[in-house]
Regions:
Chain A
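Short hydrophobic alpha-helical segments used for membrane anchoring or interfacial signaling
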Residues: 105-110, 118-119
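Short, solvent-exposed recognition segments
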Residues: 127-197
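Juxtadomain coupling helices with adjacent low-complexity linkers
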Residues: 218-255
Length: 255, 255
DNA sequence: CGGACCGTTCGAATAGCGGGAACAGGCTTT
DNA sequence: AAAGCCTGTTCCCGCTATTCGAACGGTCCG
């Protein structure tokens, strides 16, 4: 498990995914457009596009290529096979019904938080998150709950790798401040997010840990700042959340 | 738009996706396992795996590699950007609430049907379909509804490409029989599925067409055969469905 | 009618992919 | 303990397959 050994990547594969990324970002792109963006010969891009299209990974509409629904198949497969999904999903639905707010299940992967499932109550606001979204762990409640319950060396490594970019002016960007913050989260067992990712939005997040105590994901409740405050925010929601994550942890251990 | 011109695929990219496919199918695989399966040298697989892992597309857990949630990000992106999704989604939810059965939104891509969104009523059975699932168009109600409303040359081409494989003993496998069947669907505007994809499951599907009358997708209602029969199946559900698809078509035209 | 742009095809040169052999480490077996 | 066998990993070399640029054949626009 060598960490950062000098490994030479397969460049052809990289360009293939570069093309996919450009097509994704542009929400459909043409051959010359892609070639210009990536500074490749048109013929090269053409051959790649045709290869990906033959595999069904890109779809050609006229002269523009789009990403195909094969990625949806792959993605849903990943989600369904994840240990947390089956167990956490019903709990997330339950919490959404009880709190009438937006509830998310987030997992950690490669040092970032990934939203794998969300449910909303009747009166919940539409958050800006969506399924599959990747967010730096220090920027939101669920992420901080996860980060606080990782081994120290992993925490430091993640901070080294991604830094502490700000999402709003409330986002924690100072490393020492974050370390203290994480210590507090570790002590009480859950995390708050007060407009640190979206202005006007508060959230509470609690970690889901495995047998050895390491976080593998988290569940969070998010809602408008003027509704999530006072005892509801500091007492009631944490209680609900901890009850849910505790149950999830038990179910995880017996599956 | 040359159809089947002699184009040489980029083989390196193909092997990369072969590896991804093996990892997906095996639900996590090790280097030697993949190498054996694809008859490649261990060193080759290793280099590819490390490349994909560096890009975040594979995740390494110990010595086994898994597909990462990046595919979820790509996949959800594809779905959200699809014209039909935003428009059809609320209608699908509505139909599920009204009928108390499983309702699916299916789109056509590359000649196959892709389930992009599903909603279920309280009493609906769990169908065997899942988001992202790809099904041959002749095998189910939504697919037949789409197939019937494609240009003739596309229909023939799709049948040529994929054949008429059976899912149950009721699946239509005779080409002439299917042609007649499609003609009937075209006349009345919607399709039935009586245990043609899953034994014990019936369904009704209606196409969503664009301005020129070509189907771009379909919506279907599915449920147990003993519940979906008689006038409910032949009158009420088709009415509901046509009302919904009609509305979707109008909304599509004005977006 | 002509120019400018597109996607597409072709051939040729070389960069980089793939393979095999050797290494290091962990686990089981003797 | 130690020998054996299985990993994943690294290295380097040869040959193939990728890349590029130029030329072709469309189509759209002026």
């Amino acid at each position: 498990m060598a960490s950062d050994s000098r490994h030479r990547p397969v460049e052809t594969v990289e360009t293939a995914f570069d093309i996919v990324d450009v097509v994704k970002a542009a929400d459909g792109a043409r051959i010359t457009e892609i070639a210009a963006e990536l500074e490749l010969a048109k013929s090269t891009v053409h051959r790649h596009a045709k290869t990906l299209e033959a595999r069904g990974l890109l779809v050609q509409e006229g002269d523009t290529y789009r990403i195909s629904t094969w990625f949806l198949d792959y993605g849903i497969h990943v989600r369904n096979r994840h240990r947390l999904y089956d167990v956490a999903r019903p709990k997330v639905d339950e919490l959404a019904a009880e709190t009438d707010e937006k509830v998310w299940c987030v997992i950690e992967e490669h040092g970032v938080g990934v939203h794998i499932y969300g449910a909303q109550g009747r009166h919940s606001v539409k958050t800006h998150a969506r399924i599959g979204q990747r967010t730096h762990l220090h920027q939101f409640a669920a992420g901080k709950a996860i980060l606080a319950h990782l081994p120290d060396e992993r925490i430091e490594r993640i901070l080294d790798d991604y830094g502490l970019s700000a999402q709003t002016d409330r986002t924690i960007t100072d490393r020492d401040e974050l370390r203290e913050h994480l210590e507090t989260i570790r002590e009480r067992g859950y995390a708050f997010n007060r407009e640190e990712s979206v202005i006007g939005v508060h959230a509470v997040g609690a970690p889901v840990r495995n047998e050895s105590g390491t976080a593998i994901g988290a569940i969070s409740v998010a809602g408008p700042a003027n509704r999530l405050r006072g005892d509801l925010m500091t007492e009631d929601l944490p209680d609900l959340l901890l009850g849910a994550t505790n149950e999830v942890e038990v179910n995880l251990a017996h599956s």
